[in-house]
């Protein structure tokens, strides 16, 4: 009997936690440490060994020029008037990210992208390419065989898509030759930068840190929490390892609807609320109303001819309409689902949402990307 009661208590606790409107995230998922970041590297190089899919020399003269320079550095002399027609060489841009606290000799991944009119980089080998930082210093050397996705034609919605074969990757293709010096552990001040500005979350982070480390954290603004610690590597590492694992209870998210007009994609979060309004668009009319007697939201959706709109709107004003199509769960998701089921085009759907926002019944931030 006691085991059954304990099991019921456990299930109730789980249900309560699932029904909660708040959730917790660790500080490491909400912030980054100022000054500790990746550094971008870039270089120009040549790929050889292509199966006739390289640059056309007449269209990309810089490929031949680069090949001449490389061969001369290797001690190979080519007459200046020689016009080489090579189809197995391509000029490329090589990019990589140098992680923080990287050491000499470590390997990092690189991305290789064609500069000219090469048809494919498949089967090619990148020759030794220096990678430079923003200060024009060489931080890594890249070389190796390129991994390119297989070219498959995919048919979707009567359109044919092909995998990109003019770029590829080299896993562990660059070796770090120079380290980036940081001032970590040399200053008493550490700034935590929030991934998304929010005064409430910044203050919560500061308060929770001060519980574990009193008088340490201060919320400077909606984006920065400042830590006052000791200028010592060991102390700061130990302190940050503990701070980053502190749980922060998160408030409700900002109500937001994100729309991509090019693809017709719509993303809606659970905080979006609807108010009472009427939206008329083309042959579609939407009534969204809160029914006080049932203490719930419901909406009536009807498709009308143009000559029926006037009588429909009059009936709505006088509350003399038939509520046989009402849906009790008045979420924006349901309205979008019903509109989609009736064959509403994406641009019409986006226009309706914008009208609902303008009418004041869509209580959310409408973001068009």
Swiss-Prot record:
GO terms for cellular component: bacterial-type flagellum basal body, distal rod, P ring; outer membrane-bounded periplasmic space. Residues 1-24 form the signal peptide. It is found in: Bacterial flagellum basal body. Belongs to the FlgI family. Assembles around the rod to form the L-ring and probably protects the motor/basal body from shearing forces during rotation. PANTHER family: FLAGELLAR P-RING PERIPLASMIC PROTEIN FLGI (PTHR30381), FLAGELLAR P-RING PROTEIN (PTHR30381:SF0). NCBIfam families: PRK05303.1 (NF003676). HAMAP family: FlgI (MF_00416). The basal body constitutes a major portion of the flagellar organelle and consists of four rings (L,P,S, and M) mounted on a central rod. This is Flagellar P-ring protein. It comes from Buchnera aphidicola subsp. Schizaphis graminum (strain Sg).
């Amino acid at each position: 009997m006691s085991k059954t009661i304990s099991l019921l208590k456990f299930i109730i606790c789980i249900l309560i936690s699932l029904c909660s409107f708040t959730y917790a995230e660790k500080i490491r998922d909400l912030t980054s440490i100022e000054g500790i970041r990746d550094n971008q590297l870039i270089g120009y190089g040549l790929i050889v060994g292509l199966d006739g899919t390289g640059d056309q020399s007449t269209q990309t003269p810089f490929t031949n020029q680069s090949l001449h320079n490389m061969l001369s550095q290797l001690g190979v002399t080519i007459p200046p008037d020689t016009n080489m027609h090579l189809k197995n060489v391509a000029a490329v841009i090589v990019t990589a990210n140098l992680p923080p606290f990287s050491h000499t000799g470590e390997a990092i991944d690189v991305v290789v992208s064609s500069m000219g009119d090469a048809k494919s980089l498949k089967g090619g080998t990148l020759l030794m390419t220096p990678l430079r930082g923003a200060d024009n210093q060489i931080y890594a050397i890249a070389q190796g065989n390129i991994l390119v996705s297989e070219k498959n034609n995919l048919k979707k919605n009567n359109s044919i898509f092909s995998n990109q074969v003019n770029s590829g990757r080299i896993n562990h293709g660059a070796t770090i030759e120079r380290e980036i010096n940081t001032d970590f552990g040399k200053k008493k001040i550490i700034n935590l930068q929030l991934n998304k500005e929010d005064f409430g979350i910044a203050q919560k982070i500061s308060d929770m840190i001060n519980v574990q480390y009193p008088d340490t954290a201060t919320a400077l603004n909606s984006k920065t929490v400042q830590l006052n610690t000791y200028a010592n590597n060991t102390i700061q590492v130990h302190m940050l390892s503990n701070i980053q694992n502190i749980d922060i209870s998160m408030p409700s998210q900002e109500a937001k609807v994100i729309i991509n007009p090019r693809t017709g994609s719509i993303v809606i979060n659970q905080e979006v609320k609807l108010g009472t309004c009427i939206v008329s668009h083309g042959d579609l009319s939407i009534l969204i109303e809160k029914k006080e007697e049932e203490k719930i939201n419901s909406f009536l959706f009807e498709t009308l001819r143009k000559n029926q709109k006037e009588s429909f709107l009059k009936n709505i004003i006088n509350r003399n309409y038939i509520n046989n199509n009402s849906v009790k769960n008045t979420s924006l998701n349901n309205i979008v689902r019903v509109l989609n089921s009736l064959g509403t085009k994406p641009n019409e759907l986006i226009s309706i949402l914008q009208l609902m926002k303008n009418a004041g019944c869509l209580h959310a931030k409408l973001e068009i990307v």
